[in-house]
Amino acid sequence: MEKFQSYLGLDRSQQHYFLYPLIFQEYIYVLAHDHGLNRSILLENAGYDNKSSLLIVKRLITRMYQQNHLILSVNDSKQTPFLGDNKNFYSQVMSEVSSIIMEIPFSLRLISSLERKGVVKFDNLRSIHSIFSFLEDNFSHLNYVLDILIPYPAHLEILVQALRYWIEDASSLHLLRFFLHEYHNRDSLITSNSKKASSSFSKRNHRLFFFLYTSHVCEYESGFIFLRNQSSHLRSTSSGALLERIYFYGKIEHLAEVFTRAFQANLWLFKDPFMHYVRYQGKSILASKGTFLLMNKWKYYFVNFWKSYFYLWSQPGRIYINQLSNHSLDFLGYRSSVRLKPSMVRSQMLENAFLIDNAIKKFDTIVPIMPLIGSLAKSKFCNALGHPIGKAIWADLSDSDIIDRFGRIYRNLSHYHSGSSKKKSLYRVKYILRLSCARTLARKHKSTVRAFLKRFGSELLEEFFTEEEQVFSLTFPRVSSISRRLSRRPIWYLDIICINDLANHE
């Protein structure tokens, strides 16, 4: 981002101003097309790879210079030949570039916030990684959880108004209004009621969609930051980054201290936080050790706070209060709950001995098998009952490609659920994928599974389904003692970017 800033000619005193003229610079479109530019901040663009060229960019900039008024009303834009026959394509290119330009204040504020604290920035950090650190918190002493549906603005103009605190260039905000009014599905951009319209918009404008959503989440999470700063249990933290990143970097800092002690201490990343927070798929979870009355006050406080200060429409019914002792947290393929672990203690007093029954609260994260079987059945690896079937659509591939695809799916699932305390369900998934792979190969060679395995041997599939303990010992061969300790502890892999489907390469 430092190279990006110097290339644009921005300094700290004017980084929020005069963003709009950058849209007339050709190198901005080159930067938008570059996939390797600061992937931690700027999303990878896959919208116009095959069509973008310098000639098209020059033609677009020339038309913008020739047009007297770039920002037009919706009715006038339907009658103007500004964008010509390639209106949709030009509009998509401009929306991608405009979102990059408007991301500059967000990116620079995040970097400056980390520099002030001396925190090393993680380039591969994604929102999904905050789930792993959330599941490592000490939930055994907590009482209630709030399941919150993130509220959405009643009108997209509220999003533009919120951006005024970040972007002080009025022309850039007018350009954003132009793109928002350009699409007829603007009322369903953030809402979840019209998934078809929102999906249509996001597919054509990935970067602009996520930029608007991120700015919306920053406004939404400011209420939690306010409560966090009011708590005596936590330090005041700058709101220069998303709340999930604040938690992540704080936990990573404490995790480094645990590593220096060679795992002699328990891995409680936050000793006694005022609240535990995580956000996922338009929802968020807030866990606390407060009473039901306190959680109910929080519930109505959030509703009134969002409605009064941010004009975010919400209702108390969108926030659910659940007691952690008899409620499990189900989100993104995980099922977590607090259970009582019985234990018996023998006490000796003089000549008398006593047996004391004791119950200890323990927070377990398991891998639910039924959702995984449902995903495998949807992708045609097994039927609804979990019986493996061959992947007929892959029968035309080479043997190495078939085995590699099945092995990649299992490794992704294994990495994603590697931190779970109970992973017996993964053995069922491994069985389904191995037998499905064998049936796919047998179908290709026009043979039976038994004859195929007898001919090539079952060792053909073993190397592609290596256990995680073996992978770790191969990666760190000199620290076998630490690896043995790690094998008994949850291990979270930060190479997971998304888990929306089983085979994201298709």
From Swiss-Prot:
Gene Ontology terms, MF aspect: RNA binding
One GO-annotated biological process of the protein: RNA splicing
UniProt KW keywords: Chloroplast, mRNA processing, Plastid, RNA-binding, tRNA processing
Protein name, per record: Maturase K
Superkingdom classification of source: Eukaryota
PANTHER family given in the database record: MATURASE K
Function: Usually encoded in the trnK tRNA gene intron. Probably assists in splicing its own and other chloroplast group II introns.
Compartmental location: Plastid, Chloroplast
Family classification: Belongs to the intron maturase 2 family. MatK subfamily.
Disulfide bonds: none
One GO cellular component, as annotated: chloroplast
Keyword Zinc set for record: no
HAMAP family: MatK
Pfam families linked: Intron_maturas2, MatK_N
